[in-house]
Amino acid sequence: MTIDKQMTAISKAEQERLLQEAEKVSERAYAPFSKFFVGCAILTSDRKTYVGCNVENSSYGLTNCAERTAIFTAIADKDDGRKLDIKAVAVVNRDGVPCAPCGACRQVIFEFGPNAIVIYKAADGSIAQTPITELLPVGFRLD
């Protein structure tokens, strides 16, 4: 697979829409232990949007992040036989704390969107967008 070094172009309006979707779903997060409520919205190459929130578990290793929840939902919804292709991932913390994906989520995003951009609110309130290849410069691939 070839990885395009150019970021996927996402309009400002689309970025804001994805962030709003992520913010809305962060309200549904189940985070009784960390109190870190995260929402995510992904945009696929076929222009569909999927959302997910983090779901914690008493056995911490079984916790699932918002990004992976959204990606796994998109995979479960696909019925065309093609591999999921992510264009953008927006991540929001319910309390406004800037948050970028954890390492595990970066790897999963890279698997399904090697040219994806990650969108999140920076500490100054501006919208940050970073290619996944900058967040995970040497992602693991078997193909």
Task: Please give the residue ranges for each predicted region.
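Short beta-strand scaffold segments in enzyme catalytic cores
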Residues: 35-44
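Compact, glycine-rich, soluble single-domain proteins
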Residues: 54-69
